[in-house]
Amino acid sequence: MKATSPSRIVLSLALLTVLTGCAFAPEPTVDRSAPAQWTQQPTDRTDRAGEPTPGAKLTVADLQTWWSRWNDAELNALVDQALAQNLDLAQALGRLKQQRLLMGVANAAYQPEVSGGIRTLQDVAAVDSYFHASIDVAWDLGLFGAREASQRTAHAELLNVQASVRAASVALVADVVHRYLDIRMAQYQYGLFAERVALDERTVQLLKVRREQRLDTTEAVHQATLQLTQSRAQFIALKESQTRAAHALAVLLGRSQPDPKWLADGNVQRPSQHPALDLQVLPADLLRTRPDIQTAEAAVERAAGALGLSRSALYPRFALSGSLLFSYNLTQNRRTTADHMPLVGPVIDIPLFDWGRRRSQADADEAALDVAIMGYRQSVLEGIADVETALAGLSAQRKRLDLLQSTQTLIAERDAVLARRQQLGLASEFSRLSEQRAALQNRSEMAVAQGAQALAYVALYKALGGAPLPAELQAAEPPAEGRQP
């Protein structure tokens, strides 16, 4: 028998390597392009000359503690409690732990498997009984990209779970700040509404006196009474909104009941305004801060892994198999020697009769990869649009607040003139009531505008993917953007 030459062995190995490399799925190319700068800029502070004033810089690192810019110790404590006690975030972290444990068995299918077994049996003639003990070895080599595709699929699942943890953290912090601001704004509005109700009650009293003196009509009294009723109805709606926000905040903190002070009718001071921003976060930074983009990236990785597996299935599957059997004749009380020889050999699975089905599956997985790539680009565009929309809303609320401030100045000047006329006996208390109510109404609208501006900041930070990075994600190695075959 002629021995195989070393050159033939090298040639065979080279051919096997080439075939293995050809089976790899191509590296997916995703469109990561983004504008160099934002179209909108949060220049929401101006000096006396009307020029925008520089704000505090906001970098990517600052997104992890964005709520602290309100300088509110109570808000900071609530966010810390939510991050430690929220059940949705805890579930997401639990799924992350589960997926990391599963990562340890991602390559198990392509590692040598050793198994053993014992059994008793009879021969065909039912004359002798045997005791068999065997050791079996099987090793799927995972050629033609099967091993790498399986690793990629497992990595995609981990990336997806990490993105879900990030999404839960972003949504949690934004919701906590949102509900807290709702409560504080409702408590501040409570004081303004109380003043308005008192002013409307005084208006009704004075109109009744003027009606008795035939200086006004019954219709005027009815109109003032209707206005008083509407103010009281708004009072009730405000209380309902405060209660709803308090219970929602309690759920976010993992509590069954809200803190009593969240439901108090306190005439608290107006919540502090958010400082001006100098946004240093670029559109390209969204690729690593927004959870939905990370989820879309995981979908691309998962689709690429599935394509790699389906393409590897188009090629023969090679595995090594071996078995060692120990046989003992129980009837004759002696060891048999006919079956004790070890068996070692390859197992080859060649796709012949089902090759068409496998080809169709590979084509379908390739189409699924194209869809995932388009979905990734869509998520990038949506992320950029969300930030631009939040910036536009922030600018609009700033302009609205400036107009209301100018209106408040005019109302205050008018009221000062009427107050002076009243001191001189040239005007009555009744003549000032309309101006006082207009001032209260404008103050209430200013409070609403400031609340809307604060919520616009919350929307901006949420669109930027701002949230603290959980310790479980900080300890993880940054995921690779892709593997080259």
Residue spans of the language-model regions?
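A short glycine-centered flexible hinge/capping loop motif at secondary-structure junctions
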Residues: 211-215, 422-426, 463-467
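Periplasmic alpha-helical coiled-coil/stalk elements that build and connect Gram-negative outer-membrane
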Residues: 147, 163-282, 393, 397, ...
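Transmembrane beta-barrel architecture of outer-membrane proteins
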Residues: 75-77, 130-132, 178, 223, ...
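Terminal intrinsically disordered/low-complexity segments used for targeting and assembly
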Residues: 2-81, 155, 239-288, 294, ...
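Amphipathic alpha-helical coiled-coil segments and their boundaries
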Residues: 85, 92, 140, 147, ...
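Small/polar, glycine/serine/threonine/aspartate-rich low-complexity segments that form flexible
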Residues: 55-70, 80, 117-138, 150, ...
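A glycine-/polar-enriched beta->alpha junction
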Residues: 81-90, 100-112, 136-152, 163-170, ...
